[in-house]
Design a protein with these regions (language model features):
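A late C-terminal transmembrane helix in Major Facilitator Superfamily
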Residues: 326-357
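Cytoplasmic helix-loop-helix junction between adjacent transmembrane helices
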Residues: 105-142
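Structural signature of the two symmetry-related core transmembrane helices
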Residues: 77-92, 275-290, 368
Length: 390
């Protein structure tokens, strides 16, 4: 492959992986809208219902292992198979005769989800050449849109077929995998196969200068994200007493988040990864503080700013991880995604606990102040590596 080809942005390939991300994540978002029906069908307690989501996310703990494996085989295999291997268990949720089968189906879907999300950014990075940020933005937009459309698809399927009979929707996932196989067999890069016998520990040692500051950024950013993504409708309802406004606030936050995701990666190709993260993680705490303290249309504008800046950080961090991967691109992404999962899971519980003690308004102010603490860790991130470096 020529140097020019490596530098080219392969639009068709990047769009194909983004479409795969969209289709895959539509299926993986089925659980939340189906949960009330599953609770009723199987007479589940709320504790059992909550554990279903946890079981689906447990495989995220082995993301580094999946990445380690993906660096040794062709990453196309994971990406081509993922839509069907996630579609099948998620489409069978309504058929599950008991809680144990439900747990098995969701754990299988969680494994498939990890097996897609760890290597997919590696392929996007290869297809994006020198414009990795732009590639990651397009890839992440597919996932963000799926989170909006997926619940509607699940409800529509159950409305038409009924809960026990909506399983034929898995066919779309199967067709998507066949389509991806046809596309990537012809045009995709083979994926970098790591032939060395290095261990996961070796991979961590080579990546820790990147992962330690990134982990700290994920934690401090996580307080802001956990506060808003989980408790925004509750906060707005407490402030205004208007449930319609509460729901609309989350839609505004997510919509401007999608815009941020779509634009931030390309911005980081021109401004640099660290500079873009600095802009985002100065803008987000300022926006959250102002949102909490103001009223009326100014508050709406501050929510837009917060959504745009806070959610825009993910494609930039994905591009940064791939640039710094040092021959272990999937392992690097596996570590990043594991840290992201751990930070997100733990912090939502902490945010809920603080909100019980101090109220949501004070929790939002505290989260914004903690968000500012991410800034020194952004300055600790390694700079852009030269193409020839190893």
């Amino acid at each position: 492959v020529s140097e020019r080809k490596k530098a080219d942005f392969q639009t068709a390939g990047v769009l194909a992986v983004a479409v795969a991300h969209f289709i895959h994540d539509v299926y993986s978002s089925f659980l939340a809208p189906l949960l009330p029906l599953l609770i009723e069908k199987l007479s589940l307690t709320l504790t059992q219902a909550g554990f279903l989501s946890t079981v689906m996310q447990i495989p995220a703990l082995i993301n580094p292992l999946i990445g380690h494996l993906a660096d040794r085989v062709n990453v196309r295999i994971f990406i081509v198979l993922a839509p069907v291997t996630t579609a099948v268990p998620m489409s069978l949720l309504g058929v599950a005769p008991n809680y144990a089968v439900l747990l098995i189906l969701l754990f299988a879907a969680g494994l498939s989800t990890s097996a897609f999300h760890v290597p997919a950014p590696v392929m996007v990075a290869e297809l994006s050449g020198s414009r990795k940020g732009r590639g990651m933005s397009i890839f992440m937009t597919g996932g963000e849109l799926a989170r909006t459309v997926g619940p509607l698809c699940a409800v529509a399927a159950v409305s038409v077929f009924g809960l026990p009979r909506f399983y034929p929707v898995m066919v779309v996932g199967g067709l998507a995998s066949i389509w991806l196989f046809a596309i990537f067999r012809r045009s995709a890069p083979p994926g970098k196969v790591q032939s060395s016998r290095s261990s996961i520990l070796d991979s961590w040692r080579s990546l820790q200068k990147l992962m330690l500051p990134l982990g700290a950024i994920l934690v401090f950013r996580g307080f802001m994200h956990g506060s808003l993504a989980t408790f925004l409708p509750t906060f707005v309802n407490q402030e205004t007493g208007n449930i319609w406004l509460a729901g609309s606030a989350l839609t505004v936050f997510e919509a401007f988040g999608v815009a941020g995701v779509l634009l931030a990666g390309s911005m980081s190709d021109h401004l640099g990864r660290r500079n873009t993260l600095l802009i985002s993680l100065i803008g987000a705490p300022v926006g959250l503080l102002a949102f909490t303290l103001t009223e009326g249309w100014l508050r709406v504008a501050m929510l837009m700013l917060t959504g745009f800046t806070l959610l825009s950080t993910t494609p930039v961090m994905l591009a940064l991880v791939q640039e710094q991967a040092r021959g272990r691109p999937a392992a690097a992404n596996g570590f990043f995604m594991m840290l992201s999962f751990l930070a997100r899971s733990a912090i939502v519980v902490v945010v809920g606990y603080v909100a019980d003690l101090a109220g949501l308004r004070n929790t939002y102010l505290l989260s914004a102040c903690l968000g500012i603490l991410a800034i020194p860790f952004i300055l600790m991130l390694p700079g852009k590596r030269q193409p020839g470096s190893s």
